[in-house]
Amino acid sequence: MAALTVGALGLGAVAVEGASAANPTGSAAGVPLTAGSLYNVVDQIGARSLWTQGHTGQGVNVAIIDTGVSPAAALSGADKVVAMVDLSGESGDPATRFLDTYGHGTHMAGIIAGRDPGANPALAAAHPEWFLGVAPGAGIVSVKVAGRNGAVDVSQVIAGIDWVVQHAAQLNIRVLNLSYGTDSTQPYTIDPLAFAVERAWKAGIVVVTAVGNDGKAARELSMPARDPYVIAVSAAEQKNKKWKVPAWASSGDTVRSPDLAAPGASIVSLRTPGSFADVEHPEGFVSPTLFKGSGSSQAAAVVSGAAAVLLSARPTLTPDQVKRLLTATANGKAITPRAVKFSGSGLLDVAKAATTATPQATQNWPMSTGLGSLEASRGSAHLLINGTVLQGEVTILGTPWNGASWAGASWAGASWAGASWAGASWAGASWAGASWAGASWAGASWAGASWAGASW
């Protein structure tokens, strides 16, 4: 496992055919509009009306713990990808450090905050050829935890959340997107991953999670969506102008169901040429710069963008208030069947949330102690590292996991699992010099991906 690598940078424009400040024909130029085009998604959730009022997510940074981000015009500019950290097994290789070799993280980043150079959100209704995410004014903090095949250990995700909490004030991180989940075999009240997301929530960060795509018979959300503090998002699919529960959607139970639903079927976002998803799923190809994917991952990214837009309009809202507004104003009649176990309070309506009075909202669920088993938190998702399965109470760093010691530590300056993240140096990097053709993927040997994508 490579040592932690951190980078902070203002990215210059990346030359991509079909999009430039001088000629904003856009990433989506010539691409037919579908229900999953972000041009339509922003209307489906009411975000465009907020854009015209100047609320585009500006002043809000969204952390994405995922597979990194790749060079794209819609993610260029000094105020777009404001920082990157690499906690993955690829961090030691300059050819892959920070970069998205799987294709998932870039797709999420585009949905949340992508923006073609020169595109003005206030005028975007007349320009369907522009690519704009839900919160085009927001910034992205990319925390890479997985490499070429998307596999990641739960201890890496916990470390990523730890890093986000430690740097939230410095980087103005108000939202955390976690399109990841495990089939943990223990209650959230002791699960270490649940403890981690609750600490982020209590630190003032709106945590948005994907519920999973295990089918309607699953009857249990993934972890950490199972934790009642966070915003658990399921996907909705538009067919013949009517919203349906996708066949692959996970179902909640009598204890915990999704909080709300958002568009999540065939969502068109940024493509990472040569990535695992791009190579293995050619059916997802839309254009040289765009790719489509389905899942609660995409739906969670839509809600993360909506949360950023809402916070740009009302920056004093707490995470509990953001959750209450988004769930209380969701359209409960939009999706059929109308079962709460599939779609929670209904389809996201951020425009209505933005105009609803600030609620008195304080969640008082039992909190996680984090004292449970790291192995149980993994569930069935295990990494294979150099031919050995990572299992038991051992972290990705090979150090023993002590839940009592970790849960009682002060995150502000404490070391995590024997490695000091706070002492890591920040280094500049230039995407323009990244070489994709020369990268070697043959050495990848991880298995057990848990990203909540139903299909590409």
Q: Predicted regions: what is each one?
A:
Residues 21-24, 38, 49-85, 91-155, ...:
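Subtilisin-like serine protease catalytic core
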Residues 213-229:
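Glycine-rich, charge-decorated loop segments at or immediately adjacent to ligand/cofactor-binding or catalytic sites
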